Amino acid sequence: MSRLALMIDLERCTGCKSCEAACKSENALGPLERRNRVIWLGSNPETTCGENSALDFLALSCQHCERPACIRACPVNPKAISKDNETGVVTVNEDACVGCGECVTACPYGAMGYDPNGRHAVKCDLCSDRRSEGNNTTACASVCPTNAITFGLREELLKTSKKHGRGIIDNDPFLL
């Protein structure tokens, strides 16, 4: 199986939110919609003094879980959310989604959003439209100024990370 993934190097992320802007532009998302987001953690060192005045960033998007809680939570039959067995990509069928928000609530990562105009869930699909057009990277990875986001085959990304001595956060029961 050639499972696709994003690898996000948290040591390189500067919190610039270029990935958010690229995703919104690529997917023509409105101001209240999101498929990814950058969360600022900690205190602002410019306004806070002291030992713990660090600001960290967490780039967050769908983890494309092995056992997605969002699929299990979807009350629609057939499910409005599915997982591609070959690529591992979890997608929302916006036409089938009833907009109940159960999947958004069930996501353990808070990685799903909601389109109030279309009344359906939205989430990262690893730029499926771009991939179908032959583009070999995601919008977020293509604009990241620090190359903190890499798109590719999951196993290759894990090898690269290990080769560079990076720690892997890959022990979540939803991801196994």
Language-model segments: which ranges?
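Non-ligating segments of multi-cofactor redox enzymes
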Residues: 1-176
